[in-house]
């Protein structure tokens, strides 16, 4: 059975991780908060802004709807900036009705970069 992973954040880091997962045979849903960015990714099958020269295989489904991105997945990779991580995880947990983690729902992996200056987190 093929695993499905949602990668939340289609910047350079999220796109690179989506490519690595797809090359490893994982079914990937790549989500971005910007409908314009999603449309560009779908049209060009390449992240020309953040990762030019790396075509996105058809096995990567590019979506703008967060609910669709995380529906029935085995894992969720949070590749959003550190400053957006709290809001993003809260939103995902609410959409999953609190079912996030290895015993209740998809496994979460946080790969956020950066630091929040006000909290140093």
Q: Model-derived features: where do they sit?
A:
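Short secondary-structure boundary/capping segments
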Residues: 52-54, 68, 100
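NAD(P)+-binding Rossmann beta1-loop-alpha1 motif at the extreme N-terminus of oxidoreductases
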Residues: 1-51, 61-64, 91
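Short acidic low-complexity segments
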Residues: 56-73
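Short, well-ordered coil/turn elements that cap or connect secondary structure elements
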Residues: 23-25, 55-57, 103
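Short, solvent-exposed coil/turn elements at secondary-structure transition points
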Residues: 34, 66-68, 114
């Amino acid at each position: 059975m093929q695993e499905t992973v949602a990668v939340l954040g289609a910047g350079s880091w999220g796109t690179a991780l989506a490519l690595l997962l797809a090359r490893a045979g994982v079914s990937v849903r790549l989500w971005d908060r910007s409908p314009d960015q999603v449309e560009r990714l779908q049209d060009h099958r390449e992240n020309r802004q953040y990762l030019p020269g790396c075509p996105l295989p058809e096995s990567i489904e590019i979506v703008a709807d967060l609910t669709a991105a995380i529906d029935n997945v085995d894992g969720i990779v949070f590749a959003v900036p550190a400053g957006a991580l709290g809001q993003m995880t809260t939103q995902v947990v609410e959409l999953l009705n609190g079912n996030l983690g290895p015993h209740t729902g998809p496994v979460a992996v946080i790969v956020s970069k950066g630091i929040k200056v006000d909290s140093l987190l």
